[in-house]
């Protein structure tokens, strides 16, 4: 089998009940990039990548499409049933740009699953859970409002909450964490406090020092791995890496040197499902909990995150975050990813199990054959 065609689409995703706010940006709408790979057999697979604007990470929508345009001509004729070889071919065509390569990788896995008549999760090693835990990220807001939302989401069944902090006086962040804990204490809900790289080490240390009795993990409090390493032994809480986990080499370094206690990992940041499966196995070897997320996106990226999340050893699974609550229009009305009771059911069909309504996307912005 060979790749015969590659089509690239741009699609707007307005934020439902927006905006969505993190320390680095306030988001009202995002543009996702979708990739359709068509094999010479006629089978097609879908991939997606959707950065949260240009300031969250070194990735952006126009960059994804430029990178795909650079690689796509050289991928025509490649075998989509060999994801490792396909990854090496992409690396030979373009340095870096994992988030664009991920869209091709996801599409290849979708196509491969359809070819063999199995789910992507089965291709990734096998299913550990048919119903995958999710978690809810609150966004940044006033302490009382965030505490109200936290209690509401616990009542809905989410086993884990992520409280966004940063970009304001740390006193407000401390108050927010305390008020959230007052509302959810005793529920068994796990808690993460996510700085999204925004805190100076001074504020990260103070936050941890002033909340020693609250059992949260501190996720990516500071901008660089070096800053996090400097405070690692001085905080009262476990530290997870998110944005600093840029690639497998960094993950190996962080795990090997004991720089963190777990990860919040983005599927497209690390390069797709092939890379994500390797990351999962590294974490299992060192007993490091982790999530299986992405920055944003619709049903395609949500399904990919759910499939890899379903293969994670349950005791290490910190959940799958998807943007579905913030997206009004699913790509697949019947099989699209839904959160119910704080969990996501693994799609049943072959491949990703998603059949997108192509009419939503309009004509491709680029095609290669």
UniProtKB/Swiss-Prot annotation:
Signal peptide annotation: none
Cofactor(s) essential for the protein: Mg(2+)
Assigned protein family: Belongs to the mandelate racemase/muconate lactonizing enzyme family.
Alphabetic keyword roster: Isomerase, Magnesium, Metal-binding
Record carries keyword Transmembrane helix: no
Name this protein carries in UniProt: 4-hydroxyproline betaine 2-epimerase
Record function comment: Catalyzes the 2-epimerization of trans-4-hydroxy-L-proline betaine (tHyp-B) to cis-4-hydroxy-D-proline betaine (cHyp-B). Is involved in a catabolic pathway that degrades tHyp-B to alpha-ketoglutarate. This pathway would permit the utilization of tHyp-B as a carbon and nitrogen source in the absence of osmotic stress, since tHyp-B functions as an osmolyte and is not catabolized when it is needed as osmoprotectant. Can also catalyze the racemization of L-proline betaine.
Reaction it catalyzes: trans-4-hydroxy-L-proline betaine = cis-4-hydroxy-D-proline betaine; L-proline betaine = D-proline betaine
């Amino acid at each position: 089998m060979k790749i015969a065609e590659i089509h690239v689409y741009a699609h707007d995703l307005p934020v439902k009940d927006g905006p969505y706010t993190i320390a680095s940006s306030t988001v009202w709408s995002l543009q996702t990039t979708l990739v359709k790979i068509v094999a010479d057999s006629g089978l097609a697979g879908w991939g997606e990548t959707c950065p949260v604007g240009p300031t969250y990470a070194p990735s952006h929508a126009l960059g994804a499409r430029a990178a795909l345009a650079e690689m796509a001509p050289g991928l025509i004729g490649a075998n989509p049933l060999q994801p490792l070889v396909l990854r090496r071919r992409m690396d030979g065509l373009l340095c870096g740009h994992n988030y664009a390569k991920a869209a091709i990788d996801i599409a290849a896995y979708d196509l491969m699953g359809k070819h063999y008549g199995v789910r992507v999760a089965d291709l990734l090693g096998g299913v550990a859970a048919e119903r995958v835990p999710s978690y809810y990220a609150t966004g940044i807001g006033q302490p009382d409002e965030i505490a109200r939302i936290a209690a509401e989401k616990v009542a809905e069944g989410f086993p884990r909450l992520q409280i966004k902090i940063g970009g304001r006086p740390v006193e407000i962040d401390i108050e927010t964490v305390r008020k959230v804990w007052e509302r959810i204490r005793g529920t068994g809900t796990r808690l993460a406090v996510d700085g999204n790289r925004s805190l100076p080490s001074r504020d990260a240390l103070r936050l941890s020092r002033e909340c020693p009795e609250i059992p949260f993990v501190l996720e990516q409090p500071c901008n660089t791995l070096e800053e996090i390493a400097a405070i690692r032994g001085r905080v009262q809480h476990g530290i997870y890496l998110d944005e600093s986990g840029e690639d497998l080499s960094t993950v190996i370094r962080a795990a090997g040197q004991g720089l963190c206690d777990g990860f919040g990992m983005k599927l497209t940041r690390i390069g797709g499902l092939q890379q994500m499966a390797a990351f999962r196995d590294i974490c299992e070897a060192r007993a490091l909990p982790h999530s299986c997320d992405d920055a944003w996106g619709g049903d395609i990226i949500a399904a990919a995150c759910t499939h890899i999340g379903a293969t994670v050893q349950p005791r290490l699974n910190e959940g799958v975050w998807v943007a579905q609550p913030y997206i009004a229009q699913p790509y697949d009305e019947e099989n699209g990813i839904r959160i119910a009771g704080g969990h996501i059911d693994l799609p049943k069909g072959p491949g990703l199990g998603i059949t997108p309504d192509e009419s939503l996307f309009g004509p491709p912005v680029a095609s290669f054959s």
